[in-house]
Structure formats: structure tokens, C-alpha cells
């Protein structure tokens, strides 16, 4: 991922993550934006030069961007490699690009010496959950909430 691609991706990724957090937690969008910014500061402190991080731009055979993958060390500092973000352009969904990016994440994680890979998925994202389950991912923990 080039510096220009990183800048474009990061702005969109922060906003999308903030909207997901706001929806999942029932918090104001501005609070969720602060959480998203802090997450990126913590896990991407050096941008594309952050040690152990892979930022992959998925491209089709014509070189057109179809999606991105952010893979890095586990947030806890130990354990499996971690998929922080995977995004396929809305116009390219359903064509197998999400699966291809997930397979690339697994390849990169193995190359880095990992024997396990993990991710978080919002409970409302049924399409992503089906993809992950079809690739052999299983729930390790489930967080539940109820508004009062």
C-alpha cells in the first residue's frame, strides 16, 4: 500500500469503524470516532511502516482496486496474527474478493511464523460471519449487550 493509498484508506476506514462501533455499542458517533482514532494510533503507530503489519490492496486482473486487508500482530501482543480490517468495495462484493483477501491473510500469517489467526466481527455482519465460518473460523468468545 502506497502512502497515498494509506491516507485514502485510513480516512474511510476510521469513519466506517466508528459507525460500526456507534451502532454496536449504542454510543454517539463522535465518541465512536475517538475510539476509532485511538485504535489506529495504537495498532498503526507508524502507518505503513508499522512493524509486523501487512496492508494489502487487493486488485483485479486489470489492476483495479477491489478491497484492502490489514493484518498485524495480536492486539494483546501475543497469540495469533490478527485481521484488523478487511473491506471489499461494495460494487465488487459477491465476486470472491473477500475470500481471496482472507486466504492472503492466512498465507501472510503463516509466512510470519504464526500458527493461528483471529479477528473480530460485529454480530450484525451476517455476510462476513458466513464467509469466516466457511473458511473454518469459529467463535472464540461472544460479547452480548442489551439496552436498558
Where in this protein do the model-derived segments appear?
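Conserved hydrophobic beta-strand within the GNAT/NAT acetyltransferase core sheet
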Residues: 83-86, 117-121
Amino acid at each position: 500500500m502506497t502512502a497515498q493509498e494509506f491516507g485514502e484508506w485510513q480516512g474511510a476506514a476510521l469513519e466506517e469503524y466508528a459507525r460500526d462501533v456507534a451502532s454496536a455499542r449504542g454510543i454517539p458517533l463522535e465518541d465512536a470516532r475517538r475510539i476509532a482514532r485511538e485504535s489506529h494510533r495504537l495498532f498503526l503507530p507508524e502507518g505503513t511502516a508499522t512493524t509486523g503489519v501487512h496492508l494489502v490492496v487487493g486488485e483485479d486482473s486489470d489492476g483495479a482496486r477491489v478491497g484492502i486487508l490489514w493484518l498485524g500482530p495480536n492486539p494483546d501482543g501475543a497469540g495469533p496474527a490478527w485481521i484488523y480490517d478487511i473491506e471489499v468495495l461494495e460494487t465488487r462484493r459477491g465476486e470472491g474478493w473477500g475470500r481471496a483477501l482472507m486466504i492472503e491473510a492466512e498465507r501472510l500469517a503463516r509466512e510470519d511464523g504464526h500458527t493461528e489467526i483471529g479477528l473480530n466481527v460485529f454480530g450484525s455482519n451476517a455476510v462476513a460471519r458466513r464467509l469466516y465460518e466457511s473458511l473454518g473460523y469459529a467463535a472464540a468468545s461472544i460479547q452480548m449487550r442489551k439496552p436498558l
